[in-house]
């Protein structure tokens, strides 16, 4: 398979866990205004990230718009979240229950109702903040992408936003691929989801290299 990010160069590292895959590393540069994290993106990478992040933002906006109108929100300005568990499996992965007891399968109906009520209350209180944080990270990723291709330069704050947004993209793709921990290293050649899995691998290593750059001193 050709390098995911194009022709191999000095800034392109082999993804050893995924033979034949390549991804450009991030370079940490110390400046008077704090560290900067630099890399290069190809046109198809920019287009792919824009498409994936756009779909993610659409899901989050749809979830937010599904929240019922709360009279207290109108009075206090405090946003209330949707108390119901998302029906969409991708949103359920992005916005899981706040509390799941270890012995849930052994609980009686009354105890299960109590767990559901607790999760509903926690969703109503905290989900808007979580959705806003995910949306903000995704938007920062979009805002720092070049128009088509070229150099990337991230501040420490925007690098952390990239890590959060890319992680959400991986979670969303993981639902399509039915990936649970630990993720498989590869899928058979010719598998109908092999392209999606290649993208999942690329996002995983992109995130890993950026984390390593942030940790470097």
UniProtKB/Swiss-Prot annotation:
A motif (CXXXC) lies at residues 5-9. Signal peptide: none annotated. Disulfide bonds join 5-9. The keyword Kinase does not apply. InterPro entries: AosR (IPR018561). Keywords: Disulfide bond, Redox-active center, Stress response, Transcription, Transcription regulation. Belongs to the AosR family. This is Putative oxidative stress regulator AosR. It comes from Mycobacterium leprae (strain TN). The gene is aosR.
């Amino acid at each position: 398979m050709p390098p995911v990010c194009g022709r191999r160069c000095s800034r392109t590292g082999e993804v050893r866990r995924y033979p034949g895959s390549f991804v450009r590393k991030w370079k940490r540069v110390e400046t008077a205004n704090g560290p900067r994290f630099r890399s290069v993106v190809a046109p198809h990478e920019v287009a792919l990230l824009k498409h994936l992040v756009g779909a993610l933002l659409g899901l989050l906006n749809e979830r937010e718009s599904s929240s019922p109108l709360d009279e207290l929100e109108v009075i206090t300005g405090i946003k209330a979240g949707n108390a119901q568990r998302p029906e969409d499996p991708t949103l359920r992965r992005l916005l899981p229950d706040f509390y799941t007891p270890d012995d849930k399968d052994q609980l009686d109906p009354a105890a299960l109702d109590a767990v559901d009520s607790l999760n509903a209350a926690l969703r109503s209180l905290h989900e808007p903040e979580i959705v806003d944080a995910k949306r903000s990270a995704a938007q920062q990723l979009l805002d720092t992408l070049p128009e088509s291709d070229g150099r990337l330069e991230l501040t420490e704050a925007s690098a952390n936003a990239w890590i959060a947004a890319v992680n959400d993209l991986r979670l969303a793709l993981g639902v399509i691929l039915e990936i649970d921990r630990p993720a498989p290293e590869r899928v058979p050649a010719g598998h109908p989801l092999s392209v999606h899995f290649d993208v999942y691998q690329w996002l995983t290593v992109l995130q890993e290299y950026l984390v390593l750059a942030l940790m470097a001193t």
